[in-house]
């Protein structure tokens, strides 16, 4: 069972908190109960989010560089934030809270009932057919704007906010390895790590390079509530448990596939 259903927008969640929580938290509980009652031996994989950490990553001692914010190479999270970061006492956004509720419930069903549940806390999950929008799925939406000429809006942090991006193939391959040898109630950060990450500014440059034209970009000073300034996932725990897994796609590979997909549709 691969549970990817969700309400994924921060802004939409703030407008309709009850609906958001019903979809993300209660919906997950419904699936867990159905699994426990009818096929308790099944592997249950849940796509969580890095927003379960709230805005705690924004307390990191970031350094402002020309195109991005960055950590010093000697910082313990330089190679990415791992699962030891606190999920408590921070601003998550209402979306983050509903996903965290589901995240913990999936873990608990694994530990309490002995079910084969696994939680994957995603950074930016993307791929060539990602239907990104202004509210979420930034890399896909960015390339869409690069191809169409539509205006792209940057919200805060001078466009230097950093995200890691994992290709859908690589993420599904993580799921496959977990399915073959599940660990009950386990949780993993799942993202592009140091292998595939970029700032908003760097992503714009890459999209312009691949699309072969300048983008229409507008900057707004105010960041989104609870938005991360810097997020890179440390996936060393997953690699330790599943050493045969590896990345297959770089950031440029993913962007080129997006561009090809969008120009074919056009």
Predicted features by range, described:
Residues 1-123:
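N-terminal Rossmann-like NAD(P)+-binding domain of SDR-like oxidoreductases, especially those catalyzing
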Residues 68-86, 143-156, 181, 210-219:
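A short C-terminal helix-loop "cap" of Rossmann-like NAD(P)-dependent dehydrogenase/epimerase domains
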Residues 157-158, 187-189, 201-204, 212-230:
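C-terminal "lid/loop" region of Rossmann-like NAD(P)-dependent oxidoreductases
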């Amino acid at each position: 069972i691969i549970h990817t259903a969700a309400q994924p927008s921060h802004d939409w969640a703030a407008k309709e908190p009850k609906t958001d929580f019903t979809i993300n938290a209660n919906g997950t509980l419904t699936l867990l109960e159905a699994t426990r009652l009818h096929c308790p031996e099944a592997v249950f994989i849940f796509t969580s989010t890095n927003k379960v950490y709230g805005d705690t990553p924004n307390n990191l001692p970031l350094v402002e560089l020309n195109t991005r914010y960055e950590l010093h190479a000697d910082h313990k999270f330089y190679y990415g934030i791992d699962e030891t970061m606190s999920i408590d006492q921070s601003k998550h956004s209402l979306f983050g809270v509903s996903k965290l509720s589901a995240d913990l419930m999936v873990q608990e069903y694994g530990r309490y009932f002995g079910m084969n549940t696994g939680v994957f806390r995603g950074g930016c999950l993307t791929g060539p057919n990602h239907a990104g929008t202004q509210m979420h799925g930034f890399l896909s939406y960015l390339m869409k704007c690069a191809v169409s000429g539509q205006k792209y809006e940057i919200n805060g942090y001078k466009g230097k906010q950093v995200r890691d991006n994992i290709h859908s193939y690589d993420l599904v391959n993580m799921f496959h390895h977990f399915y073959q040898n599940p660990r009950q109630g386990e949780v993993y950060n799942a993202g592009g790590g140091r292998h595939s990450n970029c700032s908003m500014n760097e992503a714009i440059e890459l999209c312009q390079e691949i699309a072969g034209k300048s983008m229409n970009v507008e900057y707004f000073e105010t960041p989104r509530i609870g938005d991360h300034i810097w997020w890179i996932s440390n996936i060393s725990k997953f690699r330790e448990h599943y050493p045969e897994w590896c990345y297959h796609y770089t950031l440029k590979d993913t962007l080129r596939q997006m561009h090809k997909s969008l120009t074919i549709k056009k």
